Amino acid sequence: QDSASPIRNTHTGQVRGSLVHVEGTDAGVHTFLGIPFAKPPLGPLRFAPPEPAEAWSGVRDGTSLPAMCLQNLAIMDQDVLLLHFTPPSIPMSEDCLYLNIYSPAHAREGSDLPVMVWIHGGGLTMGMASMYDGSALAAFEDVVVVTIQYRLGVLGFFSTGDQHATGNHGYLDQVAALRWVQKNIAHFGGNPGRVTIFGESAGGTSVSSHVLSPMSQGLFHGAIMESLVALLPGLITSSSEVVSTVVANLSRCGQVDSETLVRCLRAKSEEEMLAITQVFMLIPGVVDGVFLPRHPEELLALADFQPVPSIIGINNDEYGWIIPKLLLAIDPQEERDRQAMREIMHQATKQLMLPPALGDLLMDEYMGSNEDPKHLMAQFQEMMADAMFVMPALRVAHLQRSHAPTYFYEFQHRPSFTKDLRPPHVRADHGDEVVFVFRSHLFGSKVPLTEEEELLSRRVMKYWANFARNRNPNGEGLAHWPLFDLDQRYLQLNMQPAVGQALKARRLQFWTHTLPQRVQELRGTEQKHTEL
């Protein structure tokens, strides 16, 4: 029944969805929005692991978008997100543990379609499921798409480092959503034995963390990490102190023992919590001994995880525009001389949690003795892209490829609709591939794609969905995408996809050998000084 208001069962009750049509295909899609996968994390459940959702009677309405989790909406400012329209007004609430499902209208219990679960990005401090519309992917590729939400910022990642607030609650929310999918997705025509998790930016970090977490084992069977992995210093820390100290001060709860601090924070209103959480542009997950038994670096190095087939990739200009504007508040169009650059390098090494003395080594490596301000800025951007995105992604690919099939890509196409929205020298910026994965921009808005771009989007969707179906992105009518193995071949994703080899191999040497050696030496000298 290709019904206009489909009703499906879940283990907590029935839900009614709606029928949507996707331009360019006859396939209808059933959408079920705002299904609860956990109990609202309110009151005593603030800073606690998620609890199972409660049952409801009657049929729940699944036709409107769920509230987003608490976040700083000012950052989601339209300029930065390149929105040329006003996003739908979506309420914000601490009660935000909901997911959206997009399933082909013909899908029935027993259809056994592959399932793709999207984890949104946003530095673990912002974003929402509803920014991403899964209907095109569902319609064109005959897969069930699920987009999930998780607690953000302080509410999702504050930790006292002990049992009073263990931290990673946002990650535990994601695990709860994946468990919900295992239990219920068959009712929507999905196959719980064929689940791929995919995400971009902090969503990629999340996916990468699930690959490493013993808690998530068996909840998914393939992983796609777009632009970020579990190794970005700003998104993972071994110690909860930095965040908890800031929170203790901002909340005026003071430097008290953890039990008192958590009690004090639980008594704060939603508005007060929002004011505290808005301070963080990024917030790190923490090595909690449960979700992450050890630091991701160690888990990867020791191969102490259950590998799954993976696609890992980056864009060719990750630090082109949106990230420097958000994180360093610098305008990449401003030219700076070497001295000014040195200052910025100093700030940047701090952000990357590297010893400040390494700034000069990085300048030598990336800028040589060049004095041209344009060149200096471009090289600074390349260095930051390498440090935050490219090198971590390559390292994870190298560490995973010996355990499970791994495919690597570099996305190289600059979307035509951005040409008036940012400077001409920006290539494929952070987040640019997402438009092609979903064939729509944020909140499902149609952006004008050229015919070639439509084709590129169909290709990207096909690679991603083939991977969800067969753990291998290759298929008829697509340029061959080789495994990332000893010869380090990868796919250059653009209008004419081609195979590349050994992406940035020399730089990888620099980041994995030269730099750590220098860090050791510097720490050694510091050691000596302290001893003297």
From Swiss-Prot:
Pfam families: COesterase. GO terms for molecular function: carboxylesterase activity. This is Cocaine esterase. Disulfide bonds join 69-96, 253-264. A motif (Prevents secretion from ER) lies at residues 529-532. Monomer. Glycans are attached at residue 249. Coiled coil: none annotated.
